[in-house]
Curated annotation (Swiss-Prot):
Name of the coding gene: KRTAP13-4
4 X 10 AA approximate repeats: annotated span: 41-86
Functional note: In the hair cortex, hair keratin intermediate filaments are embedded in an interfilamentous matrix, consisting of hair keratin-associated proteins (KRTAP), which are essential for the formation of a rigid and resistant hair shaft through their extensive disulfide bond cross-linking with abundant cysteine residues of hair keratins. The matrix proteins include the high-sulfur and high-glycine-tyrosine keratins.
GO cellular component: cytosol; intermediate filament
Protein name: Keratin-associated protein 13-4
The keyword Repeat is assigned to this record: yes
Family: Belongs to the PMG family.
Classification via InterPro entries: KRTAP_PMG
């Protein structure tokens, strides 16, 4: 499956997962023109609608795509929020140019995986920012995949 993000694209495979450009946003996904904010984090259903499955772009790019099924906690890099997710817990804190987002593995596990970003193409996230994206596997289990951006626009899986 793939997500359209601003002028660039973002693709992901849920089984093990990897991110790369290019791709397109399928009709099954929700396309948003603004980054998710804590006020839109609604825990009204197990899907956590409108929350995190985000294409992280440079600060000038404000369009993000969300995958309803694999959404977890909404927490963009410039905000602070925390709380229970039902499948575990997650928290994230803004640290300016060292911002970090932590996401639950989703199955009750307390473990986390992190993504270490370099500065290539991510000017607002260039000082050691770390992100983790949960993947929903066909087996019904959650798996967290970590990625590292590479100069030249491709994303490769980062072994945690």
């Amino acid at each position: 499956m793939s997500y359209n993000c601003c002028s660039r694209n973002f693709s992901s495979r849920s089984f093990g997962g990897y991110l790369y450009y290019p791709g397109s946003c399928p009709s099954s996904l929700v396309y948003s023109t603004a980054l998710c904010s804590p006020s839109t984090c609604q825990l009204g259903s197990s899907l956590y609608r409108d929350c995190q499955k985000t294409c992280w772009e440079p600060a000038s790019c404000q369009k993000s795509c969300y995958h309803p099924r694999t959404s977890m906690l909404c927490c963009p890099c410039q905000t602070t929020c925390s709380g229970s997710l039902g499948f575990g817990s997650s928290s994230c804190r803004s640290q300016g140019y060292g911002s970090r987002s932590c996401y639950s593995l989703g199955n009750g596990s307390s473990g986390f995986r992190f993504l270490k970003y370099g500065g290539c193409g991510f000017p607002s996230l260039s000082y050691g920012s770390r992100f983790c994206y949960p993947n929903y596997l066909a087996s019904g289990a959650w798996q967290s995949s970590c990625y590292r951006p590479i100069c030249g626009s491709r994303f490769y899986q980062f072994t945690c």
